[in-house]
Amino acid sequence: MKNILNLLFFCIPFVILSQQILPESERARVVDEILEDRFNNLLPNLMDKTGIDMWILISREYNEDPVLKTMLPATWLNARRRTIFVFYRDKKKNTIEKLAVARYNVGKSIVSAWDKEKEPNQWKRLIELIEERNPNTIGLNFSKDHNIADGLDKTDYDEFMANLPKKHKSKVMSAEQLAVGWIETRTEREMLIYNQLVTITHDIIAEAFSEKVITPGVTTTTEVEWWMRQKVTDLGLETWFHPTIDVQRTNDELVSHLYSFSGRPDNLTIIPGDLLHCDFGITYLRLNTD
């Protein structure tokens, strides 16, 4: 009877955590709903704030711009061939066009604007869209200061500039502030989900630091790290980065934070009185904790 009670005690946290996590099909629905809200309500404000009339994102399959990847619908795990998004903001009319220079729509929000039978050349079709709208500014994802906003590769940049008519070249500018704004800004719904994500993260840490996982004098820091990573996998989530556990003891000298990544010993046995520090983060519904 005692063994059964112990088993139930250990299973309860897992059941509670599992109940908080949506199945894949429901996750996809939520991701796409959030994305549509961001396109329709957040993006126009960001484009107005940063002064960019037209934002063009260009990526090729398996070498995606990290910003463009956050704009893909849940069923798109990668870009397809060369994927080009064009967002055009007409502030006077208070409209925003969300176009794809692709043969198919990208989810529900981004509409195909390329009929390959009429115009076989993808670059020429992109230039037609620019000419038709004649924006004052054209934002591209290149940046010296923000890695996340530097997703346009040199090949696509060179081809774009080679095809762009001379009269539009002076309009090209870095979209770094727009790209960063898109990544850093969270909607009300995302913040509700984020609170749940933080709770799940804290619950995993609490369980990892409990007697269920750690036996003082026996369990090592490496074992706890791998337990945390396995726990995330078992819950159907993803680890944002590999967990690290380091031990702080009374007589130890303070060391640089770099010690946690390269200098700390592996398989350090945890003993009574140790203060445990962890660096841990998970990914859920395209949000991350750290």
Kindly give the residue locations of the regions a language model identified.
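Short acidic/His/Gly/Ser-rich catalytic and metal-binding motifs that mark active-site loops
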Residues: 21, 183, 252, 285-290
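Short acidic-glycine loop/turn motifs at beta-strand connectors
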Residues: 87-93, 248-250, 271, 284
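Short, structured beta-strand/loop micro-motifs enriched in basic residues and often containing a Trp
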Residues: 250-262
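Short, contiguous acidic and Ser/Thr-rich linear segments
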Residues: 215-219
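A glycine-rich phosphate-binding loop feature that marks nucleotide/adenosyl-phosphate handling sites
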Residues: 223-225, 245-251
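A composition/biophysics-driven feature that prefers long, compositionally simple stretches
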Residues: 19-210, 221-233, 267
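Bacterial Sec-dependent N-terminal signal peptides
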Residues: 1-19
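Short, acidic (Asp/Glu-rich) active-site segment that either coordinates a divalent metal cofactor
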Residues: 167-173, 238-244, 263-290
